[in-house]
């Protein structure tokens, strides 16, 4: 047997593999020899195709559907397909996808809010759950505060910042407060953070309570903002999994949801993706190998996003293993380029900067001066309430 003959046979077998995988992705149905012959392999007999199927099955690339007798690609087949075909761009993206990508935010100082909007647009374009990782952006400031009474002695305080961060904390009240009193305190603090004259006249007790609530929530916010051990993670669109046949099985859906909601797993995949220069796919058993867990029976695709040439984080999508990889890779590439253009303009125009996580830096929790170094947020001294 000559080496050239073996190479030619291998080439045919791999062609059958790629064609079978492509057809399965298009139809979602097991592929039989007759179907494949009609689709792309008219020069081969069905018997020859079945022989190739058997060989690919023995190598772990295909598995037989016992109902129809057709073949279904395995995780290994999808890996081979992604490595050899996913980067080959289609002629053009669907018009609906292009229209959505054109809605991505322009340059602004609302970095986190804009990234979150971009995340929603990406999820809508791909109809998949999406996530992204982000560093912390420096010199942020509070732009709004909201206080909602949970019961007689608990309130939820919500801080909104200039860069689009939202921080929520539940605080206990030292004594019972009425809804009207809490509303007056909220209005007073809103005037303070917006640097406007107060519109509410508070009693001394309300002033003291307002100052206590504000300082408590700001200290908690600054501690969390400055002392962090991993990138921030934002996720959305879990319900989109329900539209896929693979996730109509409750056990498969539970595995996918559990994996996507595991912060450690998603942060690690996004960190890997951030250091690649192109979209990266993690398919089925590969996820099991990385984390030492049961196969989540899903796929995650990540792509880095940049400020100029500096990677800031990564976007990711999660879905069934039989994803339209070519379309997703192309969409993610165009999406990341648009995000890069917007971020680069924003960083230079607004002179923005950012910080990476510091998992081994104990000083942040011990030196109060470090808490304020990276933010323009200040505590409320007693004299400012008088």
UniProtKB/Swiss-Prot annotation:
Molecular function in Gene Ontology: DNA binding
Pfam family, any one: HrcA
Cross-referenced SUPFAM superfamilies: GAF domain-like, Winged helix' DNA-binding domain
Example GO biological process: negative regulation of DNA-templated transcription
InterPro entries documented for this protein: GAF-like_dom_sf, HrcA, HrcA_C, WH-like_DNA-bd_sf, WH_DNA-bd_sf
Domain of life: Bacteria
Keywords: Repressor, Stress response, Transcription, Transcription regulation
Function text: Negative regulator of class I heat shock genes (grpE-dnaK-dnaJ and groELS operons). Prevents heat-shock induction of these operons.
Family recorded in the similarity comment: Belongs to the HrcA family.
Protein name as catalogued: Heat-inducible transcription repressor HrcA
Species, as recorded: Chlamydia felis (strain Fe/C-56)
Gene (UniProt): hrcA
């Amino acid at each position: 047997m000559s080496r050239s003959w073996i190479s030619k046979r291998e080439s045919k077998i791999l062609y059958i593999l790629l064609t079978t995988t492509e057809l399965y992705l298009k139809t979602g149905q097991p592929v039989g020899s007759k179907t494949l012959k009609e689709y792309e392999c008219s020069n081969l007999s069905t018997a020859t195709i079945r022989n190739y199927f058997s060989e690919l099955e023995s190598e772990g690339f295909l598995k037989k559907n016992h109902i129809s007798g057709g073949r279904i690609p395995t995780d290994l087949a999808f890996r081979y397909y992604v490595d050899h075909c996913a980067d080959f761009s289609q002629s053009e993206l669907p018009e609906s996808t292009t229209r959505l990508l054109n809605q991505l935010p322009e340059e602004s100082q609302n970095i986190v809010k804009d990234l979150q909007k971009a995340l929603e647009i990406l999820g809508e374009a791909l109809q998949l759950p999406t996530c992204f990782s982000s560093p912390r952006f420096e010199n942020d400031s509070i732009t709004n505060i909201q206080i909602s009474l949970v019961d007689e002695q608990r309130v939820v305080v919500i801080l909104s910042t200039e860069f689009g961060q939202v921080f929520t904390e539940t605080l206990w009240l030292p004594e019972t407060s009425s809804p009207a009193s809490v509303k007056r305190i909220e209005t007073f603090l809103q005037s303070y953070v917006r640097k406007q004259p107060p519109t509410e006249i508070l009693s001394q007790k309300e002033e003291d309570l307002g100052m206590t609530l504000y300082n408590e929530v700001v200290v908690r916010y600054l501690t969390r903002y400055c002392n962090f051990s991993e990138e921030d993670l934002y996720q959305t669109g879990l319900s989109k999994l329900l539209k896929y046949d693979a996730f109509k099985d409750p056990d498969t859906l539970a595995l996918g949801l559990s994996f996507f909601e595991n912060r450690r797993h998603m942060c690690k995949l996004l960190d890997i993706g951030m250091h690649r220069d192109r979209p990266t796919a993690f398919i089925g058993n590969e996820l099991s190998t990385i984390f030492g867990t049961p196969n989540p029976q899903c796929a995650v695709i990540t792509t880095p996003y940049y400020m100029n040439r500096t990677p800031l984080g990564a976007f990711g999508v999660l879905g069934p293993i039989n994803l339209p990889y070519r379309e997703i890779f192309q969409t993610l590439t165009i999406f990341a380029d648009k995000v890069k253009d917007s971020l680069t303009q924003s960083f230079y125009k607004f002179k923005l900067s950012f910080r990476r996580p510091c998992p081994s830096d104990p000083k942040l929790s011990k030196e109060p001066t470090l808490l304020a170094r990276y933010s323009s947020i200040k505590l409320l001294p007693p004299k400012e309430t008088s």
